[in-house]
Amino acid sequence: IISVKDIATANMDIYETRILAISHTKYTNVLDAIDGTMIVGDSEEEITKGKILIGAANPDLLENYVEDGDMLLTGNRFENQLCGIEMNAGCIVVCTGAPISKTIQKLAKENNCKIISTPHDTLMVARLISQSAPVRYFLKKDHLITFSREDFISDIRDTLAKIRHRDFPVLDRDGKYCGMLSRRSLLNMDNKKIILVDHNEKGQAV
């Protein structure tokens, strides 16, 4: 299960530069997020290692930071693109739709380095690219609050009042998902009404 808060927290986690490798994100997700085009490589492959790195420095400095499998965000600087390939980057993202030379494409193929072209600038790509991580990575699987189809409303009302979730998953006897239960709809339900009758009175007998 995932909440809006979980998604917002994920987008704010700017310090996790290896999010794509940890979540085994497919390159197709990256292409969708940054409106990119795969120039070299297979878009169906998954990212399994490396971090996201902006290649704004000169090659002499950049080579101290690029590691095996990294995704390097660059502009039109040939020397930075070449540095990424030589340092075994897993993918080079060329921003602002800058042209990519045949030499760079050839070297990338020979070194198993993917190349993606995107019309967005480096800042925009850096902000968008983390949103390509699959939802499954953020899903919560433990300590979930669930209800059974056989639960009585009176028994779960206190839980609904304490926990500030909007919806709760409902499971069958086998633990399989059946649907969602709205907290608001249940809290607004009428309480049980009891009518006392005197069966000794003919008019009240059932």
Spans of model-derived segments:
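Feature captures the catalytic cores and cofactor-binding loops of soluble hydro-lyases/lyases
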Residues: 54-139
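Gly/Thr-rich phosphate-binding loop signature of adenosyl cofactor/nucleotide-binding cores
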Residues: 10, 17-80
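Short, small/polar residue-rich loop motifs at catalytic or cofactor-binding pockets
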Residues: 162-165
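Extracytoplasmic Gram-positive cell-surface binding/anchoring modules and repeats
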Residues: 148-151
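Tandem CBS (Bateman) regulatory domains
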Residues: 3-28, 48, 119-146, 157, ...
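Short, acidic, Ser/Thr-enriched surface-loop or helix-capping motifs
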Residues: 172
